[in-house]
Amino acid sequence: MNNTLTTIILAAGKGTRMQSAKPKVLQILADKPLLAHVLDTCQSISVDKTIVVYGFGGDQVQQAMTDYSLTWVEQTEQLGTGHAVKVALDELPSTGKSLILYGDVPLVSAETLSRLKQANVQGMSMLTLTVDNPFGLGRIKRDEQGNITAIVEQKDASEQEQAIREINSGIYCVDNALLHQYLPNLSNDNAQQEYYLTDIVKMAVADGIAIAAIEPDYEFEIEGVNNRQQLAQLERKWQAKLVEDLQVQGVQFADPNRVDIRGEVSVGQDVFVDINVVFKGKVSLGNNVTIEAGCMIKDSQIGDNVHIKPYCVFDDAQVAQGATIGPFAHLRPQTVLEKNTRLGNFVEIKKSRIGEGSKVNHLSYVGDAQIGAGVNFGAGAITCNYDGVNKHQTIVGDNAFIGTNTSLVAPVTIGQTATIGAGSVITKNVEDNALAIGRGRQVQKDNYQRPEKKK
């Protein structure tokens, strides 16, 4: 038996109701294109081949998906879902099974697709759902024994059929041999004059194939996106699910409705997240982490007992246990904070390591620097790392004291336990235990008369 699994993803729609120059499948949900959600799910279930059927904006779609290994097939005319799958037949293996998915139905889960595949015993399985309001959706017809006999589209349904509440999601797992057999025989003899993929169900029933049906765990798994309102609604449903998952793991949210998770977040115990916090990319939070209001954390690792005060931005940062950051701190890529460091108001760190117990508390920029343990940066102290062409490194030894409003002009090294006087511009290396002052002498003119304004 051939157990290979192919996915056919229909992604040719223009998405006119989006009022966008971008193809619909490139619209963003949780910081990721709709189509990318589907592709990531396919990767997680070890698909052997993925075929994407594209149409409007095909160049844009292909350029946006270069990180994936895909087979692209163009649908030049949009003549229905059956036609869309039919154009992929030349790329479809003759054996194995195929999942038929949609680029604008982004949230079907890997677990649901795995169950759908397992349910395909006789050649075809499908994802259905019983809903309160089935208007506009294809209805599932069953016989007295509960066997599926047909799918009837809304515009072709009788009054009795329109009363059926079990609907077709359009997501199937079908033996490739059946797709090769049935798709060439589809007809467009219907109200829409389109080639319905649903007609393969009728063909399978006529051949005596028992069609299996399963339901997803969540209704949003089969919800499609056609306009901005639906996109926003689906975003909120997805966010609620992600927040719920973290709550189960012990995270306390000040308001579960005012947080956005746009990636993967792993957590320890007793994490607290205040309002309007955004997580992007891969984020890990240790035990007893507190994140106050308005922070954005992207691709960062946060250790135990870290306190992040309001309105901080982290991007590719590693923060060790016991650190306190903010408010209004900006940690840029390749920032490493060691244990018990403290960053305060309006501090920016870029491509630098701040040693254990060091403090950069006020109005500072530290870039391309290696800062030792126990160092104190006074208010307004900065590293001058860029000469207009190249970046240069600043090294500060353990227990150094950098006075207020100091400029360290890289490349420069400050020795251990060195002291830099306030207001200095340091352009040369400073030895261990030395005091360096690089500023003009104070001049005082007694009885100074200010200039008077000319009349």
From Swiss-Prot:
Give the matching Gene3D superfamilies: Hexapeptide repeat proteins (2.160.10.10), Spore Coat Polysaccharide Biosynthesis Protein SpsA, Chain A (3.90.550.10)
Q: Where in the cell is it found?
A: Cytoplasm
Task: Give the residue ranges for region: Pyrophosphorylase.
Answer: 1-228
What is annotated as the active site? H362
Residue ranges for the region (N-acetyltransferase) are 250-455
Mention any Pfam family matching this sequence. NTP_transf_3
Name the EC number(s).
2.7.7.23, 2.3.1.157
Q: In which pathway does it act?
A: Nucleotide-sugar biosynthesis; UDP-N-acetyl-alpha-D-glucosamine biosynthesis; N-acetyl-alpha-D-glucosamine 1-phosphate from alpha-D-glucosamine 6-phosphate (route II): step 2/2; Nucleotide-sugar biosynthesis; UDP-N-acetyl-alpha-D-glucosamine biosynthesis; UDP-N-acetyl-alpha-D-glucosamine from N-acetyl-alpha-D-glucosamine 1-phosphate: step 1/1; Bacterial outer membrane biogenesis; LPS lipid A biosynthesis
Any one GO MF term held by the record is:
glucosamine-1-phosphate N-acetyltransferase activity
**Main location class:** cytoplasm
Kindly list the cofactors needed: Mg(2+)
In which residues is Mg(2+) bound? Answer: D104, N226
InterPro entries hit by this protein: Bifunctional_GlmU, GlmU-like, GlmU_C_LbH, Hexapep, Hexapep_transf_CS, MobA-like_NTP_Trfase, Nucleotide-diphossugar_trans, Trimer_LpxA-like_sf
**Where, in this chain's numbering, is acetyl-CoA bound?**
A379, N385, Y386, A422, R439
Q: What class of enzyme is it?
A: transferase
Q: Where does UDP-N-acetyl-alpha-D-glucosamine bind?
A: 10-13, 24, 75, 80-81, 102-104, 138, 153, 168, 226, 332, 350, 365, 376
GO cellular component term of the entry, any: cytoplasm
Q: Where are the transmembrane segments?
A: none
Alphabetically sorted, this entry's keywords are: Acyltransferase, Cell shape, Cell wall biogenesis/degradation, Cytoplasm, Magnesium, Metal-binding, Multifunctional enzyme, Nucleotidyltransferase, Peptidoglycan synthesis, Repeat, Transferase
Catalysis performed (reactions): alpha-D-glucosamine 1-phosphate + acetyl-CoA = N-acetyl-alpha-D-glucosamine 1-phosphate + CoA + H(+); N-acetyl-alpha-D-glucosamine 1-phosphate + UTP + H(+) = UDP-N-acetyl-alpha-D-glucosamine + diphosphate
User: Which intervals of the chain are annotated as region Linker?
Assistant: 229-249
How many cofactors are bound and how? Binds 1 Mg(2+) ion per subunit.
What's the subunit arrangement here? Answer: Homotrimer.
Q: Which family does it belong to?
A: In the N-terminal section; belongs to the N-acetylglucosamine-1-phosphate uridyltransferase family. In the C-terminal section; belongs to the transferase hexapeptide repeat family.
Summarize the protein's role.
Answer: Catalyzes the last two sequential reactions in the de novo biosynthetic pathway for UDP-N-acetylglucosamine (UDP-GlcNAc). The C-terminal domain catalyzes the transfer of acetyl group from acetyl coenzyme A to glucosamine-1-phosphate (GlcN-1-P) to produce N-acetylglucosamine-1-phosphate (GlcNAc-1-P), which is converted into UDP-GlcNAc by the transfer of uridine 5-monophosphate (from uridine 5-triphosphate), a reaction catalyzed by the N-terminal domain.
Protein name in the entry: Bifunctional protein GlmU
Question: What is the name of the gene encoding this protein?
Answer: glmU
